[in-house]
Amino acid sequence: MRRKVRRLTLAVSALVALFPAVAGCSDSGDNKPGATIPSTPANAEGRHGPFFPQCGGVSDQTVTELTRVTGLVNTAKNSVGCQWLAGGGILGPHFSFSWYRGSPIGRERKTEELSRASVEDINIDGHSGFIAIGNEPSLGDSLCEVGIQFSDDFIEWSVSFSQKPFPPPCDIAKELTRQSIANSK
């Protein structure tokens, strides 16, 4: 009996302790000073950039020619991105195009700043963004990602090699980005 009372007391104490936190999350519609009221309607739409064709309008052949990797397979192809892998396997070089609609480029840049050797501003054909370089001790600069902002959207090309020799990854990423910008509508 004593155990049951103690358990009940602990449960009630826990609920009492959690009540202020849960109550703070309620949508009571209270407009008292200090309450946060959104300045725009919840259903307001963002400003979208141009339309990008599948794979950024870049062909499998172009990716193969620029990367100089034979046997590339487009293993993921949909309306917002594509991924090319050597022989279709996860080991080895990989290349990808991604189109982020209504997503902040700043969050992606921050992730890059935390995980890459360097991240710099870039402008390609009048469009601003970032270029991130990743390196491996045995390979040097083997990864390059270019993200370019378009209103509330952004695109990103990622080029990553896994063994030498390979062409400069940032030259490839910049050229693929240029082609995608040219193919946008």
Swiss-Prot record:
Keyword field: Cell membrane, Lipoprotein, Membrane, Palmitate, Signal
Main location: membrane
Matching InterPro entries: DUF3558
GO cellular component: plasma membrane
Lipid-attached positions, S-diacylglycerol cysteine: 25
Pfam families the UniProt entry points to: DUF3558 (PF12079)
Residue ranges of the region described as Disordered: 26-50
Lipidation, N-palmitoyl cysteine type: 25
Membrane topology classification: Lipid-anchor
Subcellular compartments: Cell membrane
Signal sequence, renumbered to the chain: 1-24
Keyword Ribosomal protein listed: no
UniProt entry tagged with the keyword Repeat: no
Disulfide bonds: none
Name this polypeptide is given: Putative lipoprotein LprB
Species for this entry: Mycobacterium bovis (strain ATCC BAA-935 / AF2122/97)
Taxon lineage: Bacteria, Bacillati, Actinomycetota, Actinomycetes, Mycobacteriales
Name of the gene encoding the protein in the UniProt record: lprB
